[in-house]
Amino acid sequence: MSLPNKTNLLPDRPGIPPMAAMPEPETLDIPALAKAYADGDIDLICVLGPTASGKTRYAVQLARAIGHAEILSADSRQVYCGMDIGTGKDLGEYGEVPYHLIDIVPAGSKYNIYEYQAAFADAWADVRARGCVPILCGGSGLYIESATRAYKFDRENGVPAERLPQKTFYIGTLVSREERVERIDRRLDERLEDGLIEEIRGLLDSGIPAEDLLWYGLEYKFVTQYVLGKLSYDEMYILLANAIHQFAKRQMTWFRGMERDGVRIHWVVPS
């Protein structure tokens, strides 16, 4: 289905928050990073960043540069099968690089942080046991911290700290506010043109209750409301675009909070 470009619905960018002062970017020495892993100085590389900051592409480039690396996803919605366009899986971008923790539970279920932490621990151990370098990549702050900071949410469900990384090297992907706004708007147009509405209609037709799709938020929340006739197309577009911009700001706020807690993030500008 061909849809008109709706970016002009947001001429003044209402509701888009300003981003705090950007961190100073670095240039990383990739061979030195690979050697640090081989020497045991680090046991996980984590590539994080807000939505539309190029983190997946950067992680794939990094994996190729290292040569024997695999990617573990830290995305709270890419775990669901059949939720492809709205979550931006872009699986073709991985090419020959193996990936994990994507498409592991059916759409309609409600995967929780305890399940993710356990699945990550298993995948991380498997990658290391095969002599490969694990690269965690994503923008879900709670998922990242559950994997890298040995969070034990409760005594019954939390994974023991010894099963999780102890020496993570964090890399953050940076884009300017102007570029972030442009990327998010362009990507939303592309997803609508690529069949986002049809994907969500298909999920509803498969028997997944609308309230479950609303629970997933962002694309699944607002497009479901449009499909159900509760929003016009223009209302859906404006609300969704602004929600994604707000979400990107919250992600960056989370990562800067990690820094205030003592986490060193090496910020880079992805090519």
Map each language-model feature to its residues.
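Catalytic core of IPPT-family isopentenyl/dimethylallyl transferases
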Residues: 2-66, 166-271
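N-terminal phosphate/diphosphate-binding loop that engages ATP/GTP or pyrophosphate donors
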Residues: 12, 23-29, 36-45, 56-135, ...
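Residue-level signal for inorganic ion chemistry
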Residues: 75, 102, 139, 195, ...
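Alpha-helix/helix-capping structural signal
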Residues: 77-78, 141-142, 221
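Noncatalytic linker/hinge segments flanking ATPase motor cores
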Residues: 109-120, 141-146, 210-217, 243, ...
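Phosphate/Mg2+-binding loops and adjacent switch elements
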Residues: 127-185, 189-193
